[in-house]
C-alpha cells in the first residue's frame, strides 16, 4: 500500500529473481575454457575468482565489480576473461595481458563463451580481440590453426576447449 494524493492505493508488481552476470559458487561442474593462439579464456565466475587467495581483496577490481553488480541481459549472458597467456611465438608481446575482460572480437561483442568461440572459429585473416581496457590483440587465423597442436602439446593440454564447447567448430 502507498499513499497517493491523500488516498491509500494497493499496488502489485512482480519481483523477478536477479540474474547475475557471473555465476555464484558452482559444484560438480567442470570449468569452461577455450584456448586460441595460446590465450586461455574462461567466463567470470565465483569459482574463477576463488583462484586468488583472499579473492575479495586480491582479484582484479574490474572482475570484482562485475561479479557484484553485473546483471545478465539478452545481449550479454557471460563475461569472457582472458585468464592467461601460454607463451608461444604466436603471442609474443601479449604475456602481460592476462586477467582482462573481453569487449569484442572483430567488433562483435560476444554474448557468452559459445558465441565467443564461434566468432573465433569462423574468423578469417587477422582476428582482432579487444579487451575492456582497450588493449588490442591481433592474431593471424592461419598461424593460430597451424600452432594449435604445438601449444597444446607443449603445455600437455588434451583439448583446446572444455567439453561443453565441443560442438563449437568452424
Which residues does each predicted region cover?
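C-terminal recognition in membrane/secretory proteostasis and scaffolding
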Residues: 1-170
Amino acid at each position: 500500500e502507498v499513499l497517493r494524493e491523500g488516498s491509500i492505493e494497493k499496488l502489485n508488481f512482480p519481483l523477478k529473481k536477479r540474474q547475475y552476470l557471473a555465476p555464484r559458487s558452482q559444484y560438480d561442474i567442470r570449468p569452461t575454457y577455450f584456448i586460441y593462439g595460446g590465450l586461455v579464456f574462461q567466463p567470470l565466475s565465483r569459482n574463477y575468482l576463488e583462484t586468488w587467495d583472499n579473492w575479495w581483496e586480491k582479484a582484479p577490481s574490474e572482475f570484482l565489480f562485475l561479479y557484484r553488480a553485473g546483471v545478465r541481459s539478452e545481449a550479454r549472458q557471460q563475461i569472457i576473461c582472458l585468464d592467461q597467456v601460454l607463451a608461444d611465438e604466436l603471442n609474443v608481446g601479449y604475456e602481460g595481458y592476462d586477467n582482462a575482460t573481453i569487449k569484442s572480437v572483430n567488433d562483435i561483442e560476444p554474448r557468452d563463451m559459445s558465441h565467443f568461440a564461434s566468432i573465433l572459429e569462423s574468423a578469417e585473416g587477422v582476428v582482432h580481440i579487444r579487451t575492456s581496457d582497450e588493449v588490442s590483440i591481433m592474431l593471424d587465423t592461419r598461424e593460430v590453426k597451424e600452432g594449435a597442436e604445438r601449444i597444446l602439446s607443449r603445455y600437455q593440454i588434451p583439448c583446446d576447449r572444455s567439453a561443453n564447447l565441443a560442438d563449437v567448430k568452424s
